[in-house]
Amino acid sequence: MLKLDHISKSFDGVSVLNDISLEVQDGEIVSILGPSGCGKTTLLNLILGITDTDEGTIYYQEEDITKLSMEKRDFNIVFQDYALFPNLNVYQNIVYGIRNKPGLSTAEEVDALIDLLELRAHLDKKIEQLSGGQKQRVALARTMVMKPKILLLDEPLSALDGVIKESIKDKIKTISRQFHLTTIIVTHDPEEALTLSDRVLIIEHGKISQYDTPAQIVHSPQNDFVRKFILNQLVIKRDNILTLFGAAPLTAGKAV
């Protein structure tokens, strides 16, 4: 389990996160959702250990993460820009992190991931030859060969559209379930968060507005910010989302 206990963070005297407390269960998919500048990327960086908290403690399996080695944290991230190596081909990118590191993925496990993420036909290609969806799948494969227990994804769908976006969503769900990963996703898109996650953390101005299941957020938004941000931004897909979670479709100006 990952636990955040009264986390606060400021930069240059400006509060970015204020008293954030939550728990993420093993194997759970959680999205951190909010508008630009709300603190969601800072929260991801704190979990990853890139940035230190000003106040509060982050625990992984009941241990303070600042006291754990990077190996014991078992965290890995797929960055928004993929961070792939342009001078290497797809296969070389995938296995780059496990070179000379016994105990990580075997050749058979790497092959299984390549097939799961449908990359077999692209192994000899350079990164510049790939589409956005293919790059995202390579980045996922490169991360998964490291056998993380917690997978962090920074805006994994922001550069994708339509069928490609839905395909990557399916891959994220499949990987998370098959490998029993705790998966934490940063996104600004309510539709992505609601359809991809077991629970959604909604942040406004560095504070928790609601932390709940997608169905509960749709049925019972806890405040006006959640109601407006979630429902108004869904626009065309709004009625489909509400139907998916068993709520009556909204009309303009009405809330659940």
Annotate each language-model stretch with its function:
Residues 126-130, 134:
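Conserved ABC ATPase signature
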Residues 33-35:
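The feature captures the beta-strand-to-loop junction immediately N-terminal to the Walker
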Residues 145-149:
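A short, proline-enriched helix->beta-strand linker immediately N-terminal to the Walker B motif
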Residues 211-212, 220:
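ABC ATPase "signature
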Residues 105-122, 173-174:
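Conserved ABC ATPase "signature" region
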Residues 205-206:
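Conserved ABC ATPase "signature" C-loop
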